Regions:
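Short, acidic, metal-binding catalytic loop of nucleotide-sugar glycosyltransferases
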Residues: 134, 155-168, 190
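C-terminal catalytic/acceptor-binding lobe
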Residues: 4, 47-137, 294-305, 310-415
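Non-heme Fe(II)/2-oxoglutarate
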Residues: 396-484
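Short, well-formed alpha-helical segments that are part of the catalytic scaffolds
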Residues: 148-163, 180-184
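Active-site-proximal specificity loops/subdomain of glycosyltransferases
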Residues: 177-227
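Short beta-strand-to-loop acidic/aromatic patch adjacent to the donor-nucleotide binding site
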Residues: 224-239
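Conserved catalytic core of nucleotide-sugar-dependent glycosyltransferases
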Residues: 1-6, 10-11, 19, 25-30, ...
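Catalytic core of non-heme Fe(II) oxygenases with the double-stranded beta-helix
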Residues: 464, 468-578
Length: 578
């Protein structure tokens, strides 16, 4: 087998940084000498493997790619020919089989084993620690908005937290969607001056995906001061604030952080290609995505977020039309052209970096469309709209009992409250507050309010999902022995105003239990208000924005809405299990 611990990673790091010391075992020196041989092309993974110290053996294996697999042994891994049941010393690939060589090179010779993990991932790094801000590499970041995407505002909020000197960053923002123009403009208005330079192309330029990406890369290629190009698509949720530093420190010509879609095996890389050049699942794909194998992996395809050395753009990747193809999508065309030039694409899962939001069901017909993403992007929805202290409730650390069998706990973030109120006011069709109400069964409301029902804004399914996910567990905890599926014929937002409807007369709710969520703040947005339970002579007057009162609806908890004396008060109400 190959006796050197050197690997493709070291060869790649040395190839574009010849002044750096990679003299371990002399392996990189041999790689560099091989590359200078005018008679041979040592740009492929197979050639790099051959330029390692391999003991010559008369047995060479000329087999199809699927006949050579990995054989994991105690503390080491070898190539195995399953057709002949042999352990070849030399593995050579031509044409498309070179991708299989790249795959094998992720493991052999002893690059990754179950016992040691990755043995070479921390070699040849480029530490940034200790550098002055002015000494940091200059990075051009390309941000691409190609379709209507949820949580764009959150993307820019998170982008601001990226741990990298902003005066060493240039931005190229391409937005194809008129729907997102206001969010881009607001970000640039408030924070654009923090960056060394900003270039924006909007939907009015009618530039397609391939053209915008080609242009962004070319801007870096032609800028002598540009050291790196960092692609960041708008659907990327970059949770690790040190991502850019981590990728630069990997010191590879092309490296991407592994990100996945929450709860799914979908990721931003492919472990293998089919014969037609499309997705194929490699043997190790699931283990890499689920974190059972951790390392830096040579792969045939990446997308969404990746870092390129600018020196690579000025050497191997000088073609302007990297993203163009008559038959392939731009991202596939790009990776095809990268592979054609013999450039390795690496993806790292050495740390957790983030995830990708789904754009499949995103609708743009509402004021705050992200509210409707509880099904498609539940993790992002929770981070945006559920109170940051919600999880403490289940450990009894944050729940109050202001009145008998009345529980008070945080449920919504301020953003959720604001968005629900604004969505209702944007819809604008408030009821008249009379007993006659054609929206409900029977057409008569005994205790009318001025309100808008959730089904009027097509939010009924999403609201029911919210109740099941976040209210039902608390109900079952606080009312032992009671289990609910949150059947809710009435879900609505009530508006109280002194000159409209300031209060609500004493009544029982048509429910087993009621959820009553305060959507704005007393003494800030309104004065007065609150709820009084008459049987217990117990009042909650200082309601808290985003907190819910949960109480029985019938028989015991006869209650009234106290007068709102100033401003406008909003509450969200659900009658659960009538």
């Amino acid at each position: 087998m190959f006796s050197s611990a050197g690997d493709i990673l070291r060869c790649e790091r040395a190839r574009l940084d010849p002044e750096r010391d990679f003299s371990s075992a002399g392996d990189i020196l041999r790689c560099e000498r091989a590359r200078l041989d005018p008679e041979r092309d040592f740009s492929s993974a197979g050639d790099i493997l051959r330029c390692e110290r391999a003991r010559l053996d008369p047995e060479r294996v000329f087999s199809s790619a699927d006949e050579v697999v990995l054989k994991f042994e105690d503390g080491r891994v070898r190539a195995r020919n399953v057709l002949y049941d042999t352990l070849p010393v030399v593995v050579h690939g031509n044409g498309p089989t070179k991708l299989q060589i790249n795959y094998l090179g992720n493991y052999i010779p002893n690059i990754w084993t179950f016992e040691t993990g990755c043995t070479a991932c921390n070699e040849g790094l480029l530490p940034l620690e200790g550098l002055q801000e002015s000494e940091y590499p200059l990075v051009l970041i390309g941000i691409f908005i190609q379709k209507p995407t949820p949580f764009v505002t959150v993307f820019f909020e998170r982008f601001l937290k990226l741990q990298y000197p902003k005066n060493r960053l240039k931005l190229f923002i391409h937005n194809q969607e008129a729907h997102h123009e206001s969010q881009v403009s607001l970000f640039l208005k408030d924070y654009g001056s923090l960056y060394q330079d900003v270039r924006v192309s909007g939907p009015e330029e009618e530039m397609d995906t391939a053209a915008s990406r080609n242009l962004a890369i070319d801007v870096c290629r032609k800028d002598e001061g540009c050291d790196y190009f960092f692609t960041l698509d708008i659907e990327v949720v970059l949770k690790n604030e040190n991502t850019l530093k981590i990728l630069i420190e990997q010191n590879l010509p092309f490296v991407a952080p592994m990100i996945t879609r929450a709860g799914r095996l979908w990721s931003n890389f492919w472990g293998a290609l089919s014969a037609e050049g499309y997705y194929a699942r490699s043997e190790d794909y699931v283990d890499i995505v689920q974190g059972r194998r951790v390392g830096v992996w040579n792969v045939p395809y990446v997308s969404s977020v990746y870092l390129l050395k600018a020196s690579l753009l000025r050497s191997e990747l000088t073609d302007f039309d990297l993203f163009n193809s008559d038959i392939l999508d731009p991202d596939m065309a790009f990776c095809h052209n990268i592979r054609k030039q013999g450039v390795f694409m690496f993806v790292t899962n050495m740390q957790t970096f983030g995830r990708i939001v789904s754009t499949e069901t995103y609708q743009t017909s509402h004021l705050h469309n992200d509210l409707w993403q509880i099904f498609e992007n539940p993790v992002d929805w929770q981070e945006r709209y559920i109170h940051e202290n919600y999880t403490y409730i289940m450990s009894d650390k944050l729940i109050e009992t202001p009145c008998p069998d009345v529980y008070w706990f945080p449920i919504f973030s301020d953003v959720a409250c604001d968005h629900i109120v604004e969505e209702m006011e944007h819809f604008g069709k408030w009821s008249g507050g009379g007993n006659t109400d054609v929206r409900i069964q029977g057409g008569y409301e005994n205790v009318p309010t001025i309100d808008i029902h959730m089904n009027q804004i097509n939010f009924e399914k999403e609201w029911h999902k919210f109740l099941l996910e976040y209210i039902a567990p608390i109900t079952e905890k606080m009312y032992p022995g009671y289990y609910t599926k949150c059947a809710t014929p009435l879900n609505f937002v009530v508006r109280y105003k002194p000159d409209e409807q300031p209060l609500l007369a004493p009544h029982h709710d048509a429910s087993t239990f009621t959820v009553n969520i305060a959507l704005n703040s007393k003494e800030v947005d309104y004065q007065g208000g609150g709820c009084r339970f008459l049987r217990y002579d117990c009042s909650i007057e200082a309601t808290r924005k985003g907190w819910t009162l949960m109480h029985p609806g019938r028989l015991t908890h006869y209650h009234e809405g106290l007068p709102t004396t100033g401003g406008v008060r909003y509450i969200a109400v659900s009658f659960v299990d009538p």
